[in-house]
Regions:
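Metallocofactor- and cofactor-centric catalytic cores in central/energy metabolism, strongly enriched
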Residues: 2, 10-11, 38-41, 49-57
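Glycine-rich, highly charged phosphate/nucleotide-binding loops
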Residues: 44-61, 269-283
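Proline-aspartate-enriched helix->loop->beta-strand connector
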Residues: 285, 289-294
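Short, charged, surface-exposed secondary-structure boundary motifs
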Residues: 37-45, 104-109, 240-247, 333-335
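Peripheral docking tails and interdomain loops at the edges
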Residues: 308-349
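A charged, amphipathic alpha-helical module
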Residues: 2-8, 117, 121-245
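Redox- and metal-dependent alpha/beta enzyme cores, enriched for Fe-S-associated oxidoreductases
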Residues: 12-33, 211-284
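Acidic/His-rich segments in extracytoplasmic proteins that coordinate ligands and/or metal ions
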Residues: 54-125
Length: 349
């Protein structure tokens, strides 16, 4: 008897609540484009974010055709344009659009709650999709909160016992897509947590936080560690920001609880509130006792570009050093990056 393939709904931004996808009986999967963005060059402005161009290029090449739907959001103007282009030039999968507020006040939470209700109805119309109920939402919330607990335990081990869990190993776990395979990730995390209780090894070297845009390849972390550094924080939408803060359980309106969690979690530069973002980064430097912060900035990401000068000042004020690495998402200039990273680690050492 053949096994029926689980229906998959992809998403391109960590502000898309995976609990809603799970409650519809579907499997969430983060879109991580891998191809070069040359195929998309003729359809977008040259100064468009390389992550968005890579997404469009892979989609036009059919890399996501086996998925049942994709949720795109107004994370930034480039992502909004991606939704327009997707409808015109990508045959499959169908794209759903999610409007995400930029503020965190009660009006924004109320608006986002209504938006999640609309998306829930759209997801239930996908073949094999189920009606999103309170009970199904509560189950999904519990599952994701358990995942967040495990991820935060792993982050704690990474910063305190790198001999047990290095930054490269932690990144590899996150890259596997924990929310797409909850059981498999839980088994791997449990193995590491048991190993941690028996491992007392330590490793000296400059302590580094990686922040900024999404880092999709392990090369940056590997070169930091090969140069003698210790990655003690992966502070991106692929790392801590995506797993910090749990959804309140047992609430009368689970959708409102989900909306609040996603808007109130540690934010990326697309959100209003740079003072909160600076305070969060400063707290991370203090909590991890970091010596340096490496900011990964994808070319033409306007939101992060505006904030970087203020971030640099905040890092120095917190007693650390800052290195900004602009990249084309593919890290095609990786050897130039290696020279900068090695010099940075040497300076900190």
């Amino acid at each position: 008897m053949s096994l029926k393939k689980a229906r998959t709904v992809a998403y391109a931004c960590s502000y898309v609540p995976v609990e809603v996808i799970m409650a519809a009986g579907l499997t969430p999967e983060r879109l991580i484009p891998q191809g070069r963005c040359s195929k998309a060059e003729g359809f977008v402005h040259p100064n468009t974010c390389f992550y968005v161009k890579s997404l469009l290029s892979d989609a036009m090449a059919g890399a996501f055709a086996d998925m049942d739907a994709v949720i795109l959001a107004n994370s930034c103007d480039a992502m909004r344009r991606l939704y327009d282009l997707w409808g015109a030039y990508v045959k499959s999968p169908t794209a759903l659009f999610m409007d995400i507020p930029k503020k965190k006040d009660q009006d924004s939470i109320g608006f986002f709650t209504a938006e999640l209700g609309r998306i829930s109805a759209d997801l239930s119309m996908i073949p094999d999709g189920q009606r999103v109920t309170k009970e199904r939402l509560e189950t999904a919330i519990k599952q994701m909160n358990d995942l967040r607990n495990q991820c935060n335990d792993l982050f704690m081990i990474m910063r305190s016992k790198p001999g047990c869990l290095t930054g490269s190993e932690c990144f590899a776990l996150l890259q596997d897509g924990p929310d797409s395979d909850l059981r498999g990730f839980s088994q791997k995390a449990t193995t590491i947590l048991k190993r941690e209780s028996m491992n007392t090894s330590t490793k000296n070297g400059p302590r580094i936080i990686i922040t900024g845009n999404m880092v999709n390849k392990p090369d940056l972390i590997s070169m930091i560690e090969n140069a003698g550094g210790r990655v003690v924080g992966i502070d991106t939408c692929f790392g801590r920001k995506n797993y910090d803060l749990k959804v309140a359980e047992g609430m009368s309106d689970p959708l409102a609880a989900i909306a609040a969690r996603y808007l109130l979690r540690p934010s990326c530069p697309r959100m209003i509130g740079i003072k909160d973002q600076i305070q969060d980064l400063t707290n991370q430097i203090t909590d991890t006792k970091s010596d340096g912060v490496i900011v990964s900035k994808i070319k033409f990401c306007d939101n992060l570009s505006y904030n970087i000068p203020v971030f640099q000042e905040a890092v120095v004020a917190a007693g650390a050093r800052c290195l900004v690495l602009e990249n084309d998402y593919e890290w095609s200039d990786i050897e130039k990056v290696r020279i900068k990273v090695e010099a940075f680690i040497e300076m900190l050492g």
